[in-house]
Amino acid sequence: MQTLIKQIRSHLNMSQTELAEHLNVTFATVNRWENDRAIPNKLAQTRLYEICKEGAVPVYDLTLSKIKKTAESISLPAGRVLLYHGSKSGVEGKIEPKSRPQCDFGKGFYMGTEASQAITLICDYDKSKLYIVSVDLTDLDVVEVPADIEWAMLVAYHRGRMEKINGTPFYEKYRDLAKNKDLVIGSIANDRMFYVIDNFFIGNITDAALVGSLSALQLGKQYVAVTQKGCDAVKIETEIELSYLERLFMKEVAEENRAKGVSLAGEICRNYRREGLFFDEILDKARNGGA
């Protein structure tokens, strides 16, 4: 965290003594922080957060820049893809496909192309960890789901939204989409998209509106290892330390993005109105023998 504190001082144009006065600590304390001999406690980091907010210090951007720099320093052999994984309590032991079954693509080990997305999922947890990982795709059976209604329906299946049409060919199509596959690749339901897709499932927007938002948001991709073979192809390259201060800023951005999702959903409703089908209409059509 010593680098971040130096960057904060630089943005605020403060000396160590001046920062110490603002934080109500000693010069020696700030000096120890910047020389990595001590870490600010939560109270000090909360005060740092307030000072950074007042001084418009771009801590969120500084954090992403740190992560990007670390990622760029990693050299990978051919066939491996660099990704990010956020964990609420850290990865211990063997990597396994053991997330909640109700996640977007079911039970698996989730990785993504966007560091910011991985962080927003874990920023509320004190013991959370961010990892830069890689996965070797060479010998894996992979299915990539397009960023359209196919993606939404696969998510609907895994979130238990299709149970009323269980037994239909439509249901079985999505149940079996990743059958015998080691890895599923598809769009990430980020903070903004999460709200939009929920509005689709509860019947506030149509499939046309959903697909329109998928296109407009240009989402990153998630790679999900759904078998042990897939998980065995994953390697943790490094762990990125995230301070309480950084997580406070990440939490703020996540909340802002959720608010943008609410606004986006409203705009989509206005733009598409009755174009397309609502989720329940799609299920009713499937139950009655339609595709």
Language-model features and meaning:
Residues I8, N41-D61:
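DNA major-groove recognition helix of helix-turn-helix/homeodomain DNA-binding modules
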